[in-house]
């Protein structure tokens, strides 16, 4: 039995607690190839609640949880919600930036779940949260969640969300699926995946690490039906040929989002996994994950759902309004206008009820007044021989304002002169002249972040 704060329907996420209890012996989690039932998970949640009370962690305080999708982390996250805490998951943040994150979120306690079901809790600050948004959650007795942006385009922003509002969309019962959790637990996509699975009685499957072989090995061994991933990782999956080394017959759906999907990558996935449905997702920490419907498995056009969400297009840019939007940033002004609309900064094409994501406004390259979308150029360059990955960005130029630069990760060693020549020849007749990379470089390190998103500089002269 999960003895949460308040046993009536006013308790936070009471419906989720009741649902977890009803799943009983169903497998909730696969961790290190061991299945853990919902009953065992509920017992772990109860122990974590006892730990929070023993260590005098009061409702309304802020708790940082260090770790990924271990049973202890999942149990503590649930316990924190039921105990009316504001949670700050930390899994992918570099150590150098963690102190600033803890200070920004006014974290009082840091928790370190261990492999044996225990948890060490460290006091960081005995003062209750002072930020007005954090105080508002405490006054309402609502659990909260703080998620930090990657900071790829500047200072990392801290979004504060109301967990009751965020999880409300999962109350409608649906069939559960065996799902590999790939997106990090400190990312909105990871949180969305985790609670989508638990709320519907599905099974969370973890891989030993986030490499193509480890992911495919886990999917084959545990009959995974759903894989949410990023286009960057799916391209790595194709390059590695891991999909052909494992039995993935149970796989039914791959969802992808967080960055534009190259059409060439989508087509290649369709070829190697013809029985798998490919679905594009869309969401942002600030507004949550929208319900979407892809036009087809081989299409980059998608329809944005309207249940709890509204959207409009202003000057080619997507704006959203959401019932589950964040309360605000803890370290930046509110990005919402007076009517609650949020500018996503994503440029889109529109075709009837469908939209196609072109890329961020900050990443567009302005070459002598002509717009270049990095994703379009990358899609073509990925089709070149000996190319594992490529990132396109803008570089300042005194004549045109900017030129296109391409940074390649190669499959086999090749000298830069040869690569520059091949790039020009390959683009001839396939790209307009102003879109052809003028700067061609070879990357020595990975071009993606710990969250498997492309590291991309803002487009010069955008």
Task: Label every model-predicted segment.
Residues 227, 283, 322, 345-435, ...:
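AMP-binding/adenylate-forming catalytic core of the ANL superfamily
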Residues 226-228, 242-298:
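Gly/Ser/Thr-rich phosphate-binding loop
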Residues 37-39, 136-137, 141-171:
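Conserved AMP-binding A3 loop
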Residues 34, 50-93, 184, 371, ...:
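Conserved AMP-binding/adenylate-forming
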Residues 167-178, 186-226:
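Conserved AMP-binding/adenylation subdomain of ANL enzymes
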Residues 312-339, 370-372:
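Conserved ATP/PPi-binding loop(s) of AMP-dependent carboxylate-activating enzymes
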Residues 431, 443-462:
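Flexible lysine-rich "adenylation lid" loop at the C-terminal edge of ANL adenylation domains
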Residues 7-8, 12, 17, 25-56, ...:
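Conserved AMP-binding/adenylate-forming core of the ANL superfamily
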């Amino acid at each position: 039995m999960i003895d949460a704060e308040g046993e009536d329907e006013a308790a936070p996420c009471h419906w989720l607690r009741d649902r977890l209890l009803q799943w009983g012996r169903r497998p909730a989690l696969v961790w290190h190839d061991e299945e853990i039932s919902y009953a065992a998970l509920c017992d772990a949640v109860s122990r974590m609640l006892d730990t929070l009370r023993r260590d005098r962690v009061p409702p309304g305080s802020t708790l940082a949880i260090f770790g990924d999708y271990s049973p202890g982390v999942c149990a503590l996250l649930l316990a924190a919600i039921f105990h009316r805490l504001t949670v700050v998951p930390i899994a992918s943040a570099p150590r150098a930036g963690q102190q600033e994150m803890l200070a920004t979120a006014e974290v009082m306690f840091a928790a370190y779940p261990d492999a044996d079901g225990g948890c060490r809790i460290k006091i960081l600050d005995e003062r209750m949260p002072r930020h007005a948004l954090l105080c508002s959650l405490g006054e309402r007795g609502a659990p909260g969640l703080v998620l930090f942006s990657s900071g790829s385009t500047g200072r990392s922003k801290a979004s504060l969300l109301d967990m009751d509002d965020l999880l409300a969309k999962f109350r409608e019962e649906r069939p559960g699926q065996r799902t590999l959790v790939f997106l990090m637990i400190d990312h909105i996509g990871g949180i969305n995946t985790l609670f989508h699975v638990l709320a519907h009685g599905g099974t969370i499957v973890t891989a030993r690490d986030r490499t193509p072989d480890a992911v495919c090995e886990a999917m084959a061994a545990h009959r995974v039906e759903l894989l949410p991933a990023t286009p960057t990782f799916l391209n790595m999956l194709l390059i590695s040929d891991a999909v052909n080394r494992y039995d993935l017959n149970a796989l039914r759906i791959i969802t992808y989002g967080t960055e534009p999907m190259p059409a060439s990558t989508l087509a290649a996935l369709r070829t190697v996994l013809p029985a798998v449905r490919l679905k594009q997702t869309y969401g942002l920490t600030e507004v949550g994950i929208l319900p979407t419907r892809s036009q087809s498995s081989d299409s980059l056009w998608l329809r944005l759902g309207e249940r709890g969400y509204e959207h409009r297009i202003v000057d080619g840019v997507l704006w959203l309004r959401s019932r589950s939007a964040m309360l605000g940033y803890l370290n930046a002004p509110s990005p919402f206008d007076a009517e609650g609309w949020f500018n996503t900064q994503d440029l889109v094409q529109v075709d009837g009820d469908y939209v196609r994501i072109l890329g961020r406004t900050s990443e567009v390259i302005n070459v002598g007044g002509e717009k270049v979308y990095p994703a379009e150029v990358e899609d073509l360059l990925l089709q070149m021989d000996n190319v594992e990955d490529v990132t396109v960005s803008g570089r300042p130029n005194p004549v045109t304002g900017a030129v296109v630069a391409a940074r390649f990760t190669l499959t086999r060693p090749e000298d830069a002169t040869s690569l520059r020549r091949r790039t020009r020849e390959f683009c001839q007749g396939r790209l307009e002249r102003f879109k052809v990379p003028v700067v061609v470089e070879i990357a020595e390190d990975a071009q993606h972040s710990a969250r498997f998103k492309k590291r991309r500089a803002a487009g010069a002269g955008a």
